[in-house]
């Protein structure tokens, strides 16, 4: 299963504000919180 984590660009676990199974939900959370990105296994996937 893939987990999409919403964090600040430095990918620090302390900055995580959400973890989702669906990319669309993670993207919406990141878009609603300026400065946040979506990560999968430590790699930024959104925004590209």
Predicted regions and their residues:
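Aromatic (phenylalanine/tyrosine) cluster motif
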Residues: 4, 20-23, 46
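Short aromatic-glycine-(Arg/Gly/Cys) micro-motifs in beta-strand/loop hairpins
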Residues: 1-16, 36, 40
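Acidic, low-complexity, intrinsically disordered interaction modules
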Residues: 11-12, 17, 21-29, 33-35
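Short, mixed-charge low-complexity intrinsically disordered segments
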Residues: 31-48
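Small/flexible residues
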Residues: 7-9, 29, 46
């Amino acid at each position: 299963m893939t987990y999409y984590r919403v964090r600040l660009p430095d990918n620090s676990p302390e900055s995580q504000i959400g973890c989702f199974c669906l990319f669309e939900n993670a993207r919406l959370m990141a878009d609603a919180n300026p400065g946040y990105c979506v990560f999968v296994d430590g790699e930024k996937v959104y925004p590209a």
